Amino acid sequence: VVTITLNLANPSKGQYSSFVDRIRNNVRDPKLKYGGTDIAVIGAPPTREKYLRINLQGPRGTVSLGLRRENLYVVAYLAMDNTNTNKAYYFRNQITSAELRTVFPEATATNQIVIQYGEDYQSIERNAQITQGSQSRKELGLGIDLLVTSIDGVNRKARVVRNEARFLLIAIQMTAEAARFRYIQNLVTFNFPKKFDSDNKVIQFEVSWGKISRAIYGDCKNGVFNKDYDFGFGKVRQAKQLQMGLLMYLGRPG
């Protein structure tokens, strides 16, 4: 399993950006081009090497994520508990116990724990118990300092579902979503390393990955859409206005 590491003990803007680029480059098929653009496209679903491991090296320990390479869904994470035992927590309908062993060999079968809620944002948000504002991940914010704090909430601690869900919401957005959307990657580097308030545009991007990918794949020529598109933050006519980092795999270009 390919492992990509982000050092958060002494991070820099450049390190974070190249970390996101490495995720993107690991899953892209350089031969695929959609809509006459140069935007990276995920390769066809792999038959082997289905997963990617990401190590988030915090100042007080490492927590790891398992991602599906065909869509960058976060399917599991690995953390030490309060007895210094490696535990792997996973979404059962996204990865099997045997596959989990290949991603996180440190955790024995008895130390694999099924996450009892769904892997979609709404399920994770409910378990994160966000009380302010929209009660969604938007209220948590983003940023390197926040990622480090959220890692500390799950590293070398007894499992607390609220802290786990908050860690997942922040980590998913700063890894997979940042790889999909340069807009998010750029917000993190612009505010580096500080925590910053998320905005509606971040959320609109995150829920529109499929829609945007399909529009570029099927209704875009030389980077220009055949009509105006509105993905929730105003009309766009050119694909480059979307600052995309990575498109969903939709087959060979038509």
Swiss-Prot record:
The keyword Hydrolase applies. InterPro entries: Ribosome-inact_prot_sf (IPR036041), Ribosome_inactivat_1/2 (IPR017989), Ribosome_inactivat_prot (IPR001574), Ribosome_inactivat_prot_CS (IPR017988), Ribosome_inactivat_prot_sub1 (IPR016138), Ribosome_inactivat_prot_sub2 (IPR016139). It catalyses: Endohydrolysis of the N-glycosidic bond at one specific adenosine on the 28S rRNA. It comes from the Eukaryota. Keywords: Hydrolase, Plant defense, Protein synthesis inhibitor, Toxin. GO terms for molecular function: rRNA N-glycosylase activity; toxin activity. Its EC number is 3.2.2.22. It is an enzyme of class 3 (hydrolase). GO terms for biological process: defense response; negative regulation of translation. Expressed in seeds; most abundant in the perisperm. The keyword rRNA processing does not apply. Thermostable at 68.9 degrees Celsius. Exhibits N-glycosylase activity. Catalyzes the release of one adenine from a ribosome. Acts as a ribosome-inactivating protein and inhibits protein synthesis. Induces cell death in Huh-7 liver cells. May contribute to the protection against plant pests and predators or play a role in regulating the death of plant cells. Belongs to the ribosome-inactivating protein family. Type 1 RIP subfamily. This is rRNA N-glycosylase sapovaccarin-S2. The lineage of its organism: Eukaryota, Viridiplantae, Streptophyta, Embryophyta, Tracheophyta.
